Amino acid sequence: MLAVARIAAEGLARPVLIGEAGVIARAAEAAGVDARAFEIVASESTDPRAAAQRAVELARAGDVDALMKGSLHTDELMSAVIHKSHGLRAATRISHAFVFDLPRYPKLLALADCVVNIAPHLPAKRDILTNAIALLRTLGVVRPKVGIVAAVETVNPAIQATLDADSLVALAQTGEWGDAIVEGPLGFDNAVSAEAARIKGMRSQVAGDADLLLMPDLNAGNMLYKSFVYIGGGECAGLVLGARVPIVLTSRADSMTSRIASVALAMIASAGQPAS
């Protein structure tokens, strides 16, 4: 609720609170926030799934430009989002991307997918890249540099991530993502350090200058994302992509900066997102 108040005060978005009115009022009072300052759309019951469905209805109708998870569980919101007939599915697979500001990296760095797709196969990785590259372009990255991350830099038939990386690079060469530089497989060290790539004798346009890292699976992505935050001192904004509207999935441990940055990113993505 404090994040909602900050978002409104800073003019980033016009918050619409969705749920049972009494629950919203009590949450606002506990946070010291005047709920009357916001538009409230009441759901029919205290069941969080009713609030999720109402939010999806508003998004389908074009009455809201983005969704942000409040006090309900992620699966309660996402079940409504991915509903086959009444959800927010669009042309591509739904995925997630973080955009990081890291103290020791020279520019913003995106990671995908660290939240939604557990063990993506090749077609899923293609869609994850499609969504994340589109997000980068809304941020002004005209020619994204993408590293497909694996444990090793060479294609190894025993490591599926390296085979997928090789296939994605070949797909990029057909123009699948337009003017984007896609390289892989890259070890994480090579992807973020030109010096590491030089020592290993690699020639790369991406090493040390990546805009986006495609992680091999959710385990690797989620651990790297949390390492960036809790050890690396990074701040991040994250979005669910590939739905009709961008979706902010907050965690209880997220910083206020991360929450506000995610909403700002959602507004940018929404403005640059083609109509469904």
Where on the chain are the PLM-derived regions?
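Anion-binding alpha/beta catalytic cores of soluble intermediary-metabolism enzymes, centered on
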Residues: M1-V206, D211-S276
